[in-house]
Amino acid sequence: MARICKVLIVENDRYVRELLGDAFEDEGFLFDTVENGPAMDEALDRDDYDIVVIDVTQPGDRDGIALAENAHAQGCGVILTTGDHRHVERLEESGRHYLLKPFKLRNLMDVVEQILTLASMECVRRKHRDGSRFPARGG
């Protein structure tokens, strides 16, 4: 049975948070939404997420790039979003997936698929390194 992907959306703009939630729901993903870093930390402590979508501009002392480090450390794929083009250099240096607002929801889903594909490939590599073998072909 295939495992369903779970997404956490960290966005302080309620409208954008709801729009992203609707997009993930339409694509069949499970999702939760929170509006800031402390709420993200609580959600990550409470539940397991495959992907975290984080707006770079956040209230408080940690921006989205700092929040991404925490999410990544917990094994989540991360997508950063921003409407401020001044963040592009830092986003590129972070090595994380990112999208500049406004973006097409299809582009977001394409990045989600890339992350899930990479995670699946890493899982196969890990099993292979650990001595697991693929079943023999034929019969």
Predicted regions and their residues:
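Acidic, metal-coordinating helix/loop segments flanking the phosphotransfer/catalytic sites
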Residues: 8, 33-51, 59
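Conserved acidic carboxylate
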Residues: 11
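Two-component/phosphorelay signaling modules centered on CheY-like receiver
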Residues: 14-32
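Conserved phosphotransfer microenvironments
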Residues: 55-72
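Hydrophobic/aromatic residues positioned on beta-strands within the core alpha/beta folds
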Residues: 79-82
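As written
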Residues: 90-100
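C-terminal output helix
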Residues: 103-115, 120, 124-125
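CheY-like receiver
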Residues: 118-139
